[in-house]
Amino acid sequence: MASMAATTNFTKSMLFPFSHVSGNASLNSQRRTWPKQYKSKNGYRSLRVNGLFGGGNKDNNSEDGQSKAGIFGNMQNMYETVKKAQMVVQVEAVRVQKELAAAEFDGYCAGELVKVTLSGNQQPIRTDITEAAMELGSEKLSQLVTEAYKDAHAKSVVAMKERMSDLAQSLGMPPGLSEGMK
């Protein structure tokens, strides 16, 4: 009879390895301790540990020499490829910004009485006003300066968009992508 009780307890422990079973408890009255249950505001919650990326190859024999870890097996390679692409884009973007900062765009008013020069980053560099524009009065001069500034700004923006579009195409992006971001 003692061997029968030992066999029953052994069988129960094999079937329910994460349960506490007292000697006289039945299978229905067992209290499971795994997964751990925690009481929260909305009731009990359980904590489980699940393998997300497959597992290791136990026999270390692989047909193609690579570890097969389920559907995410090549995740590290994809991550490294994305990181390299980001680095290339950052380097190219910095180079384009430096080129634009060095470029100068001149804008003129009607009659070319006022000339405004902007950088490729739309930073004002200088304003040239002729003697003839000075004689027109402050109100008219203000309009001419504004007109010249708008002309220079428009030229700078067009050049910047063209340069960014060229950059996007050199990186393999579709040519019409930048037009949709207006």
Curated annotation (Swiss-Prot):
**One of this protein's Pfam families, by short name?**
YbaB_DNA_bd
Q: What is this protein called?
A: Nucleoid-associated protein At2g24020, chloroplastic
Give GO MF terms, alphabetically: DNA binding
NCBIfam families of this UniProt entry? DNA_YbaB_EbfC (TIGR00103)
Quaternary structure annotation from Swiss-Prot or TrEMBL: Homodimer. Interacts with ALB3 and ALB4.
Residue ranges annotated as coiled coil are: none
Q: What happens when the gene is disrupted?
A: No visible macroscopic phenotype under normal growth condtions. Increased number of plastoglobules (lipid bodies) in chloroplasts.
Keywords, alphabetical = Chloroplast, DNA-binding, Plastid, Transit peptide
Species of origin reads: Arabidopsis thaliana (Mouse-ear cress)
Q: Could you tell me which Gene3D superfamilies the record lists for this protein?
A: Nucleoid-associated protein YbaB-like domain
This protein's GO CC annotations: chloroplast; chloroplast envelope; chloroplast stroma; chloroplast thylakoid membrane; vacuole
BP term (GO), one: protein import into chloroplast stroma
Transit peptide start-stop: 1-48
Function according to Swiss-Prot or TrEMBL: Participates with ALB4 in thylakoid protein targeting. May function with specific subset of thylakoidal proteins. Binds to DNA and alters its conformation. May be involved in regulation of gene expression, nucleoid organization and DNA protection.
Q: Belongs to which family?
A: Belongs to the YbaB/EbfC family.
Places the protein is found: Plastid, Chloroplast stroma
